[in-house]
Design a protein with these regions (language model features):
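Mature, structured domains of secreted/extracytosolic soluble proteins
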Residues: 1-176
Length: 176
């Protein structure tokens, strides 16, 4: 079967709506071959769209990623090619990006409106708590100590993209 980790790890094509997220994983040194460092077992990911990440990078809203941008052709890279991320910036970016992955051992199934996944609090890979809400016709997530409720994109009728090692949803804003 196909793997969520592999799909993200090998993504080089800007046409994929998760391309920018995959490139942030690479910039944070989280990719090892076809796997994502630190992810084990089943995972549920909430992935900001390329457009969301492009705007967030331009606004310097992503911790550890101030030196990154999305170019006109849609590729993600350094603002100044001679000035890569420091190890501290990579650690900061990794800690932030890890917020978007839920530990699936704490999650009963793929989530969609009406699924078996209960409203409640779930731990993410940064060790922070995500508040998950099934609103009946839509889904939302929020960092427990965060200020922003993030809506899951309805573009695909709130159904997740499923893989043998997990699933993901798109979101159209950042966790703050």
């Amino acid at each position: 079967g196909s793997s969520l980790q592999k799909a993200l790890a090998i993504c080089q094509d800007t046409r994929y709506p998760y391309y920018c997220f995959a490139q942030l994983l690479k910039q944070a040194d989280m990719i090892s071959g076809e796997t994502i460092a630190g992810l084990a077992g089943r995972t549920i990911a909430f992935i900001p769209t390329n457009e969301t990440l492009k705007n967030a990078l331009a606004g310097k809203e992503i911790p550890g990623a101030d030196k990154l941008m999305v170019y006109e052709d849609g590729t993600l890279g350094l603002i100044d090619s001679g000035n890569g991320l420091t190890s501290d910036e990579k650690i900061e970016l990794k800690k932030y990006i890890s917020n978007y992955f839920l530990v699936a051992s704490s999650v009963p199934s793929a989530c969609y409106p009406g699924s078996k996944m209960e409203n409640g609090e779930y731990v993410n890979y940064s060790g922070n708590t995500i508040v998950y809400k099934d609103l009946g016709t839509s889904l939302s997530i929020q960092l427990k100590d965060g200020t922003k409720v993030v809506q899951v994109s309805g573009k695909y009728n709130y159904f997740p993209f499923c893989y043998n090692d997990g699933c993901f949803h798109f979101i159209e804003s950042l966790l703050m």
